[in-house]
């Protein structure tokens, strides 16, 4: 489902959403919760949600968070996951899109942070800079980025170096 969604988004001109993105988001979501001291089980829930969060793109980009959550629900039921784990995972997935969702717990917060901080130049598929949309500009402008969790200060910090001739730091936050 992930690769089909990535193909669909490629045809539509969107940034890369392949297994590479899914793995990066899964790893980052897990790392965030691990560093914050959450138990291994909660870390695993965030990793699963991170990996599955965009598979609904194979249905349609519009409302993909909800499609992804419903698809994940079906798969997790088939795999006999406990109901409370399914609920945590699909809730996080369904909440990850900034237009229709919000962080409602640690798993969803970690997923949202991990997804929104995966900014990399190699995610841009559009070769014509003049035709870049906001996502293309932000990703293409990203020279380097790192996400740091400071437990003592209770701060999660994204350090991002942008080529400001391509995109301003304010554009990143739109």
Q: Can you name each region flagged by the protein language model?
A:
Residues 60-63, 81, 170:
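Short acidic, glycine/proline-enriched loop segments that cap or flank alpha-helices
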Residues 36, 79-83:
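Inter-helical turn/loop segments and adjacent helix faces that build the functional surface
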């Amino acid at each position: 489902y992930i690769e089909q969604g990535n193909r669909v988004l490629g045809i539509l001109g969107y940034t890369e959403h392949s297994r590479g993105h899914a793995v990066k988001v899964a790893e980052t979501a897990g790392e965030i919760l691990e560093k914050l001291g959450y138990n291994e089980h909660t870390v695993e829930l965030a990793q699963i949600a991170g990996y599955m969060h965009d598979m609904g793109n194979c249905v349609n980009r519009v409302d993909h968070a909800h499609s992804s959550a419903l698809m994940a629900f079906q798969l997790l039921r088939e795999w006999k996951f406990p109901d409370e784990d399914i609920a945590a995972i699909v809730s996080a997935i369904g909440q990850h899109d900034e237009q229709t969702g919000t962080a409602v717990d640690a798993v969803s917060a970690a997923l949202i942070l991990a997804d929104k901080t995966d900014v990399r130049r190699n995610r841009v598929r559009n070769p014509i800079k003049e035709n870049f949309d906001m996502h293309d500009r932000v990703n293409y402008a990203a020279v380097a980025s790192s996400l740091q969790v400071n437990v003592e200060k209770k701060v999660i910090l994204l350090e991002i170096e942008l080529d400001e001739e391509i995109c301003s730091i304010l554009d990143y936050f739109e």
